[in-house]
A protein has these predicted regions:
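Phosphate/pyrophosphate-binding loops at sites that engage ATP/ADP/AMP, CoA/4′-phosphopantetheine
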Residues: 47-67, 108-109
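Glycine-rich phosphate-binding loop and adjoining helix at the ATP-binding site
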Residues: 44-45, 77-124
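Short glycine-rich, Thr/Ser-proximal phosphate-binding strand/loop in the N-terminal lobe
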Residues: 4-45, 49, 82-84
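Generic short amphipathic/hydrophobic targeting helices enriched at N-termini
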Residues: 6, 22, 61, 111-117
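Short glycine-aspartate micro-motif
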Residues: 5-9, 64-69
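Short glycine-rich anion-binding loops that position phosphate/pyrophosphate groups of nucleotides
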Residues: 13, 73-76
Length: 124
């Protein structure tokens, strides 16, 4: 059974989410404000809540999700899953986002790529 992926695009204004089928069809999408002035923890909590909402509204579980692809507009350490710096979003300095998300949803792998590649990585 081929599983779906979640794509997350973290931008300066909004964080956009999508559930994507193995054939590239967007099954669900939504967004939430980034609110960078509130600090990265606020945005991370919004990301967690949005993932929970996405999974609930699409009846998704570990049985049909096998990865989350992230896109960030800044310097990323892909190997270690760390956001080194997002120049346009304050507070995102050396944030171990892959580790944070893996602890939140332990059954998926978290991938990090530039914004332009987030959906491609999500379909990997």
């Amino acid at each position: 059974m081929t599983k779906n992926r979640i794509g997350i695009d973290v931008g300066g204004t909004n964080v956009k989410f999508a559930l994507i089928s193995p054939k590239g069809k967007i099954l669900y999408s939504n967004s939430t404000p980034t609110r960078s002035e509130m600090g990265y923890e606020y945005t991370v909590n919004n990301i967690k809540q949005a993932i929970s909402t996405l999974m609930s509204e699409t009846n998704s579980s570990s049985k049909n999700i096998d990865g989350i692809g992230f896109g960030f507009p800044g310097q990323i350490d892909y190997k270690n899953g760390v956001v080194i710096n997002l120049p346009n979003i304050s507070g995102w300095n050396n944030v171990h986002i892959a580790e944070i998300i893996k602890k939140f949803i332990s059954f998926v792998e978290a991938f990090l790529k530039y914004v332009s590649n987030v959906l491609k990585v999500s379909l990997k």
